[in-house]
Every structure is written in structure tokens, then in C-alpha cells.
Amino acid sequence: MAIKLIVGLRNPGSAYEQTRHNAGAWLVTALAQRHNSHFKIDKKMQAELTEIDINNHPCRLALPLTFMNHSGQTTRIISQFYKIEPGEILIVHDELDLPVGRIKLKTGGGHGGHNGLRDITAQLGTGEFHRLRIGIGHPGHKDLVHQYVLSRPSMHDRQQIYDAIDRGIAIIPIVLSGDMARAMNQVNA
């Protein structure tokens, strides 16, 4: 099934823009820029939206205007309005359980403690959507997670995350075609 909607998870606002938790939005923003596509605020959809077309595969890109914990609301509104099935959605998000700079493509599964994924699963009524997980590393103890994800990465970590974003963007044409197995083999290797 071809992907018709890519959502980059984030917390909106300049205070959060450069934090680890916004790594998903970094990728979606970079993808739009590389295709000379510009986001426009759509209050009805509760998101900044744009469209790209790669090899005759059109796709909407969304950056929620809601905070991370309410990402599902935005995703549900957009998917219902445009009649997009959960299996046609790719959620791009930060991942504590991957080392900094690793990237993995996954279909379905649980939320793994990620509040954005938790809300998307609840709002869509299923976890059967695709996820592109960008490794941000783990602070070492669960009590440090909140502060860690809302902090800015070091220059070294930021560069590793940017490198992962480049690898993620490289597989988007394959993802949009619906060949998830090939995309997974390429990015998860």
C-alpha cells in the first residue's frame, strides 16, 4: 500500500524546535525543502501542510500544530478528511531505544512509551501504521527521559541525527511506492 501521508512528530514553537523530541519534524521539514515545497498553516487540520510528488506518487506532509501528546488528533483529522487509511500513513518520530544516528522503518507495533505514538494509536483505533524511527539515544535512566527529549542534542549528536535524516529521506521514494520490504532492507541494514 502506497504512503499518502507523512507526519513529522514535534512539539510546536521556537522553544522546542531544536530539541531531540522534534527529530521527526526535522526529517519532514528537510524532505519538503528538498522538493521545493512550502508548508502552510491549516487550522482546520491542526497542522502545517504541504504536498510533494515523487515519481508520480503524491503525498501530503504534515507537521502538527498540537503538542506531541495530542499528535493523534491531528493525524486522525487529516486522515479522515482525505480518506487515508492507517496503512497509508508514515509517522516519523524520535526514538529513545535506538542509538543516536540509527534509523529504522517499522510497520505496526506498540507505542513503546512514546506519547505521540500512544495518542495516534488511540485516535486511529489501531497501531497498524508505518513508523520511521530516528535514534536519539537514551539518557541512561528513565527519570532523565523527560528532560533529555526536551533538550538540544550536542553538535556531534545533531550531526549524527542529520545523517540519519539523510538516510531516511533517501528511502522515501521507495516508501511512497509502497515497497516497504525493500525500504526496510535498505534503511535497516
From Swiss-Prot:
Subcellular location(s) per record: Cytoplasm
Cytoplasm in keyword set: yes
InterPro entries named among the record's database cross-references: Pept_tRNA_hydro, Pept_tRNA_hydro_CS, Pept_tRNA_hydro_sf
GO MF, any single term: peptidyl-tRNA hydrolase activity
One term under GO cellular component: cytoplasm
Disulphide-bonded residues: none
Transmembrane segments annotated in the record for this chain: none
Site keyed Stabilizes the basic form of H active site to accept a proton: positions: 94
Marked site: Discriminates between blocked and unblocked aminoacyl-tRNA: 11
E.C. no: 3.1.1.29
Keywords: Cytoplasm, Hydrolase, RNA-binding, tRNA-binding
Catalytic reactions of this protein: an N-acyl-L-alpha-aminoacyl-tRNA + H2O = an N-acyl-L-amino acid + a tRNA + H(+)
Positions with a binding annotation for tRNA: 16, 67, 69, 115
Active site (record annotation): 21
BP GO annotations: protein quality control for misfolded or incompletely synthesized proteins; rescue of stalled ribosome
Domain of life, source organism: Bacteria
Enzyme class (EC, first level): hydrolase
Assembly behavior: Monomer.
Purpose of the protein: Hydrolyzes ribosome-free peptidyl-tRNAs (with 1 or more amino acids incorporated), which drop off the ribosome during protein synthesis, or as a result of ribosome stalling. Catalyzes the release of premature peptidyl moieties from peptidyl-tRNA molecules trapped in stalled 50S ribosomal subunits, and thus maintains levels of free tRNAs and 50S ribosomes.
Similarity comment text for this entry: Belongs to the PTH family.
Descriptive protein name: Peptidyl-tRNA hydrolase
Species in which this protein is naturally found: Legionella pneumophila (strain Paris)
